[in-house]
Amino acid sequence: MSTVAIVDFGSQVTQLIARRVRELGVYSEVFPPSTDFQAMASRGIKIDAFILSGGPNSVQQLHGVPNAVSDVLNLNLQKGVPVLGICYGFQMLAHYFGADVAQSVAREFGRAWLDVIEPSSITEGVWSLGSKVDVWMSHSDSIVGEVPQGFRVVARSADTGAVAFMCNDERKIYGVQFHPEVAHTPGGREMLDNFLKIAGCTRDWTMGSFLHTQIGAIKSATDGGRVVAAISGGVDSSVASVLVHKAIGERLVCVFVDTGLLRKGEAGVVRDLFVGKLNMHVNVLDKSALFMQRLAGVQDPEVKRKIIGETFIEVFEQEAKSLGDIKFLMQGTIYPDVIESGVGESGTKIKSHHNVGGLPEIMNLSLVEPLRHLFKDEVRLLGKELGLPSAILDRHPFPGPGLAVRIMGEVTAERVELLREIDNIYIDMMRDSGLYDHIWQAFAVLVPVRTVGVMGDGRTYGYVCALRAVTSSDGMTADCFPFGETDERKLEFLAFLQKVSRAIVSNLQGVNRVVYDMTSKPPATIEWE
């Protein structure tokens, strides 16, 4: 099986490169800049192609070249392994080979236009010589002057004239200032496909092959030990637990913790799935009082996440002790959780996830995270491979900390119950209207401000709730629904929101105003906290 190694310099979309490569049927892994690829090669580990990611830093700040870059280019010279540098990776290549890289006079962010001045095997069938093409840029530095010796310019920025694409055909080294991995670059997927063809990669990576590999990896990692699985009824933990159960059978103990912060009827959904449909035993722990006690008076979202993460692990450690010889804790952590927590060497932290940055530094259980390198859409594909019902796989994502991060400010029992009912009305009406399956994620947020209203002949002073609905494929970027829909569809959704607003205000005491969140990701995250 071919392998593409992606060197992560801290871009928030690095994992999209891995996802695009996998979509094209080639296995990919993400490595930190400190990786010793020469040592890996000496141990017989074969890498078929390298991709250097973007990142938030500047090559002007470098004191020497990262080990991984030296290794990558030495392996390119010795073994002819193709290399593609993207954005910061492109600047790194230019810097390594002697070009001057400095801050641009005019920085480029978002859509940009390029003039195609030379053909390239990367752009074959994608760009036409002499054409003007649009791409997605996000950079502050550019090559100043000429490209390095041995390289030629394929495309320049139409606005600034800066080099946007250079290549060294003899050594199969390619550098692009733009981001072919994002959906906003037309033809980006085809360019990556051409790069994989140049590398001679075999297209044999599928969810079936991933499943086979992971079963072996789980067996090896657990080494006969028992595993306690943290399940929530959501897509991620459901797929992860079924996968681990397939690998180790009865050595897996499933535990469902009712934090008091879950969706309405969640415990029943979990019992129906795992006990009724999958014939897996589940221990149900009602720890709602403990979580509410720990969260009392806390307003800061990062502190809330840390408390939930620490309490979550504490509960599982206690349960593991009561169960006997438990050595491992399974969690349904996925790639976007890891990325946004900024746990890589070069990543910029956005927020903690209770499955990642919210974990205490010292644990008495070793983690098993079989989905850690999968995106949400890949998790669903794996779930289908495992035979999970669509009723579970098509559920909207729900955050590990639950409703606590959808209540701005302090979490109280009153606020949790109010938000739970608001969310239930919103989602039930969305299902009834046939909208649910067209939306990637929808939820309600309780805003800790009160506004004046009028109901009947009386004055009210109630909370504001915000409704959110987004479209996405992987959770890394998202548009508010119904962006991109027809005008008729937009009007239908507006009418739907009005019905939901009336239902919430009419049926629930404590809320007298409903607003809709129109923000995309970026600049916002999907969840409010």
Curated annotation (Swiss-Prot):
Reactions accelerated catalytically: XMP + L-glutamine + ATP + H2O = GMP + L-glutamate + AMP + diphosphate + 2 H(+)
Pathway as given in its UniProt record: Purine metabolism; GMP biosynthesis; GMP from XMP (L-Gln route): step 1/1
Any single GO CC term annotated in Swiss-Prot or TrEMBL for this entry: cytosol
Pfam families for this protein: GATase, GMP_synt_C
Keywords: ATP-binding, Glutamine amidotransferase, GMP biosynthesis, Ligase, Nucleotide-binding, Purine biosynthesis
Gene Ontology MF annotations: ATP binding; GMP synthase activity
InterPro entries: Class_I_gatase-like, GATASE, GMP_synth_C, GMP_synth_GATase, GMP_synthase, GMPS_ATP_PPase_dom, Rossmann-like_a/b/a_fold
Residues at the catalytic site: C87, H179, E181
EC number: 6.3.5.2
Organism superkingdom: Bacteria
Binding positions for ATP per the UniProt entry: S232, G233, G234, V235, D236, S237, S238
Domain GMPS ATP-PPase: 205-395
Record-linked CDD domains: GATase1_GMP_Synthase (cd01742), GMP_synthase_C (cd01997)
All copies of domain Glutamine amidotransferase type-1, residue ranges: 3-204
Cited function: Catalyzes the synthesis of GMP from XMP.
Subunit comment: Homodimer.
PANTHER family linked: GMP SYNTHASE [GLUTAMINE-HYDROLYZING], GMP SYNTHASE-RELATED
Protein's UniProt name: GMP synthase [glutamine-hydrolyzing]
Organism of derivation: Anaplasma marginale (strain St. Maries)
